[in-house]
């Protein structure tokens, strides 16, 4: 794995996190060259951290900006720039096998042996804070989904308030019901396999209704974010500047929608739930089973 500014360290991972889940959570920021999850050879489980190498250093920086201190599988993760030590040219030992390296660069993954508790209090638990920002981090919201009356799981989404603040705030408040209305009880009325799952019409549940927190409709904010991967979260519309409450989750790359629909976030957890929803779809868009958001809100 490369040791330049294209490689990031992801720590604090829950046991159930897999390489595929990491790929789904981090690929919205750019093309990924490699993912490595060092294993504990006794337990055969990963050691609670991973290294992700991007094709471009700018994409790695974007991943750090958006994913550090975010939630993945119920745990807050740390995302920093990986800072490997120099190794001999003839050494095939991976950098993460060196405990000295882990103590310096892997946050609170390891503690030095015999360290007194008083000293531990003084040691930062979050490791090397490569980027410290005072501004508010991008919000995370969730949908708890039922399919055919049965619980299907939770989808967690990161909203890009740093790029499209107005659109992200609309979606956030519709998840929290701060205005007295929103997505709770709303259905996904249109699902097309290998394309997208559309919902958000909480007034008619058929694609003809819904409203934003700003009124019935509001203008397109910008088209800076693209429909570049599975899990992209974008606004549905009936033409330019007709955004309301309806949205869709892409199940594949849909770049023909770029500059026509406003992308405002992406799925960071619950990809398997989106796939369950997708399997209920049809070419016409009519789901074979009712897909309902039975609970929703913001993760703090």
From Swiss-Prot:
Its main location: nucleus. Its EC number is 5.2.1.8. It is an enzyme of class 5 (isomerase). Keywords: Isomerase, Nucleus, RNA-binding, Rotamase. SUPFAM superfamilies: Cyclophilin-like, RNA-binding domain, RBD. It is found in: Nucleus. It catalyses: [protein]-peptidylproline (omega=180) = [protein]-peptidylproline (omega=0). PPIases accelerate the folding of proteins. It catalyzes the cis-trans isomerization of proline imidic peptide bonds in oligopeptides. Combines RNA-binding and PPIase activities. Belongs to the cyclophilin-type PPIase family. PPIase E subfamily. This is Peptidyl-prolyl cis-trans isomerase E. The lineage of its organism: Eukaryota, Metazoa, Ecdysozoa, Arthropoda, Hexapoda. The gene is cyp33.
